[in-house]
Amino acid sequence: MSHLAELVANAAAAINQASDVAALDNVRVEYLGKKGHLTLQMMTLRDLPPEERPAAGAVINAAKEQVQQALNARKAELESAALNARLAAETIDISLPGRRIENGGLHPVTRTIDRIESFFGELGFTVATGPEIEDDYHNFDALNIPGHHPARADHDTFWFDATRLLRTQTSGVQIRTMKAQQPPIRIIAPGRVYRNDYDQTHTPMFHQMEGLIVDTNISFTNLKGTLHDFLRNFFEEDLQIRFRPSYFPFTEPSAEVDVMGKNGKWLEVLGCGMVHPNVLRNVGIDPEIYSGFAFGMGMERLTMLRYGVTDLRSFFENDLRFLKQFK
């Protein structure tokens, strides 16, 4: 007990001399640890008469508290000094130019889809969607393509079983729409479709958009006028356009639509036709009262023609050098 004041003074001196937190912790252990000087002072209480022990214990505890407060204060000083030193070493030169955040951009196929949806939206078309895993009825039968029809062989279909498949066209959306609502109908149906083919101009998955109008007094003239306006708007040119007779099981008459390319050659861009009466009957619409036209086009093909892309596979390879050109 006689050395208590001296111990506190020595502890204070050691605390002030500690140059970092590690050295300060050594001082704490020396004086307040399990075998520290002040801790050992508590053991001397057993040598005192019982009536003196409470007062003596209070004095020792006060000394320990004094040392602990000094330790806390010094630790705060050392940590603050260390932080200031680190901040000084990490000073940021605010005069340097900042790092520019590079803006992203839409994929070229997405840009094409958005552009087409915007055009037809102004004509009163609404966007309709449907399942990508389709059944045999909606993908083929309802579209006037029964099981024995040779057109099925042209689709290179991915089958799950005898009746389930990955849709080969978005025409199933038209069937579902016509079964769900009565005319007038005016929709476009964008979406992914699947065919078992892969080369420079074909991929197993690609994007298609189909359009459909069903109403009274719809004629081939309406179809031609709509597609003329669309193609000239899409390519932003007064294009030379021709309609070639063709065959699709779900339209009659049917046509392929070509545009004149910059090289003086005709380029096929889409297929179209008047909705076949059998298709209307299959969905419960009377072909004696209503008529309609439909058209379908590949989004990748239109994107290739619009931007001069020569390899369809470029759209799916995620090459930033390619994609950045469309920002």
From Swiss-Prot:
Binds 2 magnesium ions per tetramer. CDD domains: PheRS_alpha_core. One of its GO terms (molecular function) is tRNA binding. GO terms for cellular component: cytoplasm. It is found in: Cytoplasm. It catalyses: tRNA(Phe) + L-phenylalanine + ATP = L-phenylalanyl-tRNA(Phe) + AMP + diphosphate + H(+). Tetramer of two alpha and two beta subunits. This is Phenylalanine--tRNA ligase alpha subunit. The gene is pheS.
